[in-house]
């Protein structure tokens, strides 16, 4: 079984712990979907975290995904606890950078992005809270490309040719494979 260490990072209140709870619930690791606002999130174990509704200490949870064992690290998002978050970076295989669709890219989001690039951690961006009024998918994608990286692409479209071309353009080896096979590898 392959072991993967994956960190969840974001600015405060973007929904890191909520996303982590969802992953644990959908994988069958926890029986009840906890909520930060209900003070019953599985990963917010300290009373101070539950009282304030924020993550203060990085937490670990483990779940299985196919033949992979995922070690999930939920990190603090508040800038005051950045040192706690930064300590986790040296052990990550992958990261998920959570961005609130309602708030867009924040200053701390840019700092996290730069750190992830510095540590050369492959990163997925997860846009949360897109159901809130005033969110605009296209404006947010433009902001991601301008403030983070031009290579940000949407994976929600499925495996159509346009999406595969966008994915292929992010890496020369992937592009070579795409040009030869008209698809990309699943890994």
Where are the model-predicted features located?
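P-loop NTPase switch module centered on the Walker A-proximal segment
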Residues: 1-99, 105, 143-152
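P-loop NTPase catalytic nucleotide-binding module
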Residues: 1-14, 33, 101-187
């Amino acid at each position: 079984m392959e072991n993967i260490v994956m960190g969840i990072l974001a600015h405060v209140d973007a929904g890191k712990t909520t996303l982590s709870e969802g992953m644990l619930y959908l994988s069958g690791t926890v029986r009840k979907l906890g909520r930060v606002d209900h003070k019953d999130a599985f990963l917010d174990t300290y009373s101070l975290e539950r009282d304030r509704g924020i993550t203060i200490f990085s937490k670990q949870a483990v779940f299985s995904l196919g033949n992979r064992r995922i070690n999930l690290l939920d990190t603090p998002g508040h800038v005051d606890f950045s040192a706690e978050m930064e300590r986790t970076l040296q052990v990550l295989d992958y990261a998920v950078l959570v961005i609130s669709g309602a708030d867009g890219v924040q200053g701390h989001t840019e700092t996290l992005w730069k750190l992830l690039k510095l540590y050369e951690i492959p990163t997925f961006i997860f846009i949360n809270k897109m159901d809130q009024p005033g969110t605009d998918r296209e404006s947010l994608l433009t902001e991601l490309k301008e403030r983070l990286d031009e290579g940000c692409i949407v994976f929600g479209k499925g495996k159509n040719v346009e999406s595969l071309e966008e994915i292929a353009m992010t890496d020369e080896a992937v592009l070579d494979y795409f040009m030869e096979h008209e698809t990309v590898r699943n890994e």
